[in-house]
Structures are given as C-alpha cells and as structure tokens.
Amino acid sequence: MNTVTDQPHSISVNQLRAFIERIERLEEEKKTISDDIKEVYAELKGSGFDSKAVRSIIRLRKKEDHERMEEEAIIQLYKNALGMS
C-alpha cells in the first residue's frame, strides 16, 4: 500500500485517490442534475409559468410549516410597516 509518511500522520495514497475520484464523479453528477433542472425551468417558462414564482414555491416547500408561517408573518409585518399592504 502506498503511503505518504512525510506528514505527521501517514495517509494512504490509494484511499486519498479514491476519495478524490468519488468527489469528482459526484461533482459531474451534480453538474448533470443542474443542467437537467435548468431544462425543466426552460420547459416551465415555455409553458407560460413564471419561473421566479416557481422557485419561490420550491424554496417554501422545503421549509417546515412553522418556519414558513413565521417567515410569512415577518414579511407581512415588514410590508405593513412600509405601507405596502
């Protein structure tokens, strides 16, 4: 097994290489998924939907109900304070 012993702790070169290669594969998959998501947003926009509004909905759906309700209450409070409601 190849090891690097110049460091205070020995590092397995093979293990390090495996970690790096896994990260590289995952980064490539992440790029592919990101490209797929962009395509879906383009289709969505082409169908007449507002992509900005859909992004907001997706962001809100990731939150727990109580977090979402708290955020909406704070936004409403700020809008009221600024005379926007």
UniProtKB/Swiss-Prot annotation:
Signal sequence segment: none
Pfam families: GapR_DNA-bd
Molecular function per GO: DNA binding
Domain of life: Bacteria
Membership in a protein family: Belongs to the UPF0335 family.
Name of the protein in question: UPF0335 protein BQ12070
Source species: Bartonella quintana (strain Toulouse) (Rochalimaea quintana)
